[in-house]
Amino acid sequence: MKNIFLHSLIVENYRNFKNLELKTDNIPITIIGENGSGKTNILEAISLFYPGRGLRSARLADICRESEDHCSVRALLQSKLGLAEFSTQIKRISNRRTTEYNNSKIANNELSKFTSMVWLTPQMEGIFTSGTSDRRKFFDRIVYNFDPKHAELVSKYEHYMQERNKILAEDMWDNNWLKTIEEKMADTSIYIANNRLKTLEFMQQAIDDLENEFPKAELSIDGMVEQKILNGEEDVVGFIAAELHKTRDKDKLLGRTSFGVHKSDFLVKHKHKNILAKFCSTGEQKAILIAIILAEMNYAIKLTKTAPILLLDEVFVHLDDRRRNYLTEFFISINLQLWVTATDLKGIEEFGNKSQLIKL
């Protein structure tokens, strides 16, 4: 089994840090500090070496230290392809971010070829009651760990969709070009939908197989394209292209694309109670989310033979003793690089004693 882990992390002008350098190994790491000391900022910096905008989904301008026009994060990382140097540079004025692998520029969506990460933050605990987009992006990040090409597919689809919206905004359409773009969207949609359905099956099996102190979840995708594939319907590509053609006038008025895999929703039920997670208590929602994260991590290791970096922000807060003790024992037993933040070691003394301690 390959372990993805950081050997070192260097941040400059990042959030509240002018300069910070950390040396680490393939072991659990506990970051202790008061609220506002920068614990989550460190996790966010690490998460930038995975497709997307990091665990906060923050605007680039908000990441740079106040009064600084640029910031950077560098890492020496044991990747899927061996030891490598990664860096990301952010410029506030141009609102641009560049990423490098061994001093060569790469696209953000290519990072899943090299790294694998799973994270859980307090902000994610509201995912079941937030918008469809948040849940879909959460699930697509899970798919990245099972299929590294998925990030590139999602990025391509979004590019084609933006092109379509631009064409529709014009007074005169180039029908041939519009038809080509819609066909590309349809083709890419099938790959995205199939990847989601395949991962959904993997994840459900992982949840059902994993015995722990957290509630079982029942997962599903609510999307027209995914449903047609599940039903075994023929020529789904043709159906998507026809729907996009049919909604042109409507989408021109809306200024956006109203149909497609970018509208699918990721639904989660409390299996035992047979109710959607959004109707559960906040405590149950957090427990269900932890169960999903544990299943994702376990099955990613089983399927890809690669152990991801695990980033857990204040994961022990508001857990009862039974679940906190289970997580403590579980995290001590697994062989991967795990980053945990806490204001102090109260209740997790055993975990703190067996991890590298970073005090801010």
From Swiss-Prot:
The RecF protein is involved in DNA metabolism; it is required for DNA replication and normal SOS inducibility. RecF binds preferentially to single-stranded, linear DNA. It also seems to bind ATP. Keywords: ATP-binding, Cytoplasm, DNA damage, DNA repair, DNA replication, DNA-binding, Nucleotide-binding, SOS response. It is found in: Cytoplasm. Its main location: cytoplasm. One of its GO terms (cellular component) is cytoplasm. This is DNA replication and repair protein RecF. Belongs to the RecF family. ATP binds at residues 33-40. It comes from Rickettsia bellii (strain RML369-C). GO terms for biological process: DNA replication; DNA synthesis involved in DNA repair; double-strand break repair; SOS response. The gene is recF. PROSITE patterns: RECF_2 (PS00618). GO terms for molecular function: ATP binding; single-stranded DNA binding.
